[in-house]
Amino acid sequence: MTSPSGTGIVVFGAGRIGSSLAHGIAEADEFDAHVLVTTRSGAPSARTEGLSLVSNADGATRADYAFICTKPQDTAALLDEIRDDLRPDTVVVSFVSGLTTQWFEARLGAGRPVVRVMTTLAIELGCGASVAAGGAHATPDHMSVVNSLLTTVGTSVEAPEDYLDAVSGISGGGIAYFYFLVEVMTQAGVKEGLPVDLARDLLIQAAVGAGEMMRASGRHPAQLREDVMSRGGQTIAAFRELERHNVRDALFDAVAAAHARGRELASQSELDSRQSKSTNDENAEPV
């Protein structure tokens, strides 16, 4: 099966990522996937308005594709709850930061198809950038369906799972870097005498325009940057200051720090999960 039409999609966790995915898929005109949502409280909220809510157990039995959108520290407990209710052919699609496909496969049993996805909060506006990696038992058909579903909320590409920690350093949190640039440059514009709203609006449009120019032209960002620069002009003067303050090195270090922290969080999540499982096993009543 390579088309999501008629597919049962159950989203476990209705936070910003989960609810945005559910709405995007449910409202897509391309296919008529059946979308259900579970929440921790079981109660509807503004984020789940217009969506069908079910219990975790009910959702597990009805899912062709189970989207796991929980916090890392809550994921092990959810899987323990739904593991026995999932059908053998249900594909588990994880949006959980730091947890690998191997971690899910070990928790859910041999042969379970698992797909791991990194995305961005821009999926709220249908502008997300998602990267999907298949586990040991995910087939090309599984990946095709997942990518089709993800295109309802932005773009989606496949990549080896080894790339995903690095992806999180430039894409997962990458939009925050652009927010920071707009924030600081707005302050700089105000310092130079511009009204704050005007400075911010101009910079937002500059960011949108730059993104569209890179996408539409296919040219290297350095080439596009050089198009803006004129000999002895304002932009060259600005970039001399950026180089003097080693902004390039700071960005390299920021991405490296995010990558390293992602690996630390993944290791800690796996350790916490093993400790929790060990404690539960020790506290289990004898049969």
Model-derived segments and spans:
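Glycine-rich beta-alpha junction loops
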Residues: T39-G42, V96-L99, T119-I123, S171, ...
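Catalytic, metal-anchored helix/loop core of enzyme active sites in primary metabolism
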Residues: I170, V182, E285
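NAD(P)-dependent Rossmann-like dehydrogenase/reductase catalytic/cofactor-binding core
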Residues: T2-S5, I204-V287
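NAD(P)+-binding Rossmann beta1-loop-alpha1 motif at the extreme N-terminus of oxidoreductases
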Residues: M1-A57, T61, Y65, V190-E192, ...
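Small-residue helix-packing motif on alpha-helices
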Residues: V35, A60, T75, P195-L202, ...
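Rossmann-like NAD(P)(H) cofactor-binding subdomain of soluble oxidoreductases
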Residues: L21-H23, L36, G42-S45, E49, ...
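Aromatic-residue-lined binding/catalytic grooves and analogous aromatic/hydrophobic interfacial grooves
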Residues: G174
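Internal alpha-helical scaffold of NAD(P)-dependent oxidoreductase catalytic cores
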Residues: W103-P113, A129-V167, Y177-A216, R261
